[in-house]
């Protein structure tokens, strides 16, 4: 997973550090090319975003990929690789300010603990950092899917304190809707590129417009539903584990209470016989409390479930619209 070397000087968290992300068209093409060359199936590709901050707008002007490597490549130093790349870009007078990272996704699967830790590391070091999520499957169906996300101030505070217990999340009032905030994206090209795109569009052959009504998302919908069911199963298992923890805590509290009562009765009997009462013992040392499970993983699972649901809603609404348009065209031909 992408990592960012933290620095000692970090600015305080602002409510709206970045209100808009402006991306050069070249960066978008580099991200797409990176996945086409190295991404296969569910394999994730990642890279570094470079640019600068202008007021409340983050301008991403360049990027470079992380090379594919395995855990066995002990000689590969990711931080050293980033520093060498940034020094090389500085020598050729290219923007080299580290402003975030990008990652591809497989059927919208990106809400994970690894992404949370990486984005926290970036955002803690550089306040304006964002993560770009590129969906190649949705893009292959005709619409570019590229979104920018940041961790919310609430989640940043929780990650700093590292209190992922149920009480800590409840105290911070953090739900799955409060984990990530989406930042609007604007893709910018130079005037020469815009003219070239206009000329290419004029020269492009006219395709059959009825192809737009093709319901080609059945496989995508089936896979999204399968992934959704898997996450729901994970959530169900986690609920069972947490309920077991709560029962164990209740049993232990009852055992502590029974032990304390027995100890008091025994001391009263010893005093009535004129004997010295037994010394007091630390009950908490005698009864080791159960390990409190982290509630961050269920929160992330809930966020991923919500992402799948939004994707499914988008595809089903598109298909319903296509069905209505196809019906209208059929009525006209008849």
Swiss-Prot record:
Residues 251-262 have a biased composition (Low complexity). The keyword Protein biosynthesis applies. GO terms for cellular component: eukaryotic 43S preinitiation complex; eukaryotic 48S preinitiation complex; eukaryotic translation initiation factor 3 complex. GO terms for molecular function: metallopeptidase activity; translation initiation factor activity. GO terms for biological process: formation of cytoplasmic translation initiation complex; translational initiation. Residues 21-155 form the MPN domain. Residues 247-284 are annotated as: Disordered. Its main location: cytoplasm. It is found in: Cytoplasm. It holds the Pfam family eIF3h_C. Component of the eukaryotic translation initiation factor 3 (eIF-3) complex, which is composed of 13 subunits: eif3a, eif3b, eif3c, eif3d, eif3e, eif3f, eif3g, eif3h, eif3i, eif3j, eif3k, eif3l and eif3m. Belongs to the eIF-3 subunit H family. HAMAP family: eIF3h. This is Eukaryotic translation initiation factor 3 subunit H.
């Amino acid at each position: 997973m992408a990592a960012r070397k933290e620095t000692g000087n970090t600015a305080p968290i602002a409510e709206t550090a970045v209100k808009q992300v402006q991306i050069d068209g070249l960066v978008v093409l580099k991200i797409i090319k990176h996945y086409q060359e190295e991404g296969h199936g569910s394999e994730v590709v990642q890279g570094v975003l470079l640019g600068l901050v202008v007021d409340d707008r983050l301008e991403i002007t360049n990027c470079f990929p992380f090379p594919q490597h395995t855990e066995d490549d002990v000689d590969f130093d990711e931080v050293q690789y980033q520093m060498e790349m940034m020094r090389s870009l500085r020598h050729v007078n290219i923007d080299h300010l580290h402003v975030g990272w990008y990652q591809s996704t497989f059927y919208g699967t990106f809400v994970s603990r690894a992404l949370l830790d990486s984005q926290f590391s970036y955002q803690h070091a550089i306040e304006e950092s964002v993560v770009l999520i590129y969906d190649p499957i949705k893009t292959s169906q005709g619409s570019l899917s590229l979104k920018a996300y940041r961790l919310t101030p609430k989640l940043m505070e929780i990650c700093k304190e590292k209190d992922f217990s149920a009480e800590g999340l409840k105290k911070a009032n953090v739900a799955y809707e409060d984990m990530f905030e989406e930042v609007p994206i604007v893709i910018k090209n130079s005037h020469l590129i815009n003219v070239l795109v206009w000329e290419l569009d004029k020269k492009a052959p006219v395709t059959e417009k009825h192809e737009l009504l093709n319901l080609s998302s059945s496989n995508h919908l089936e896979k999204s539903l399968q992934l959704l069911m898997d996450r729901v199963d994970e959530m169900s298992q986690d609920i069972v584990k947490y309920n077991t923890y709560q029962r164990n805590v209740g049993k232990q509290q009852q055992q502590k209470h029974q032990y304390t009562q027995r100890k008091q009765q025994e001391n009263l009997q010893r005093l009535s016989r004129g004997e010295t009462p037994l010394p007091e013992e630390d009950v908490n040392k005698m009864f080791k409390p159960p390990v409190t499970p982290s509630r961050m993983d269920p929160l992330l699972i809930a966020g991923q479930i919500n992402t799948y649901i939004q994707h499914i809603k988008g595809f089903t609404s598109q298909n319903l619209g296509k069905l209505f348009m196809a019906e209208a065209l059929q009525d006209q031909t008849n």
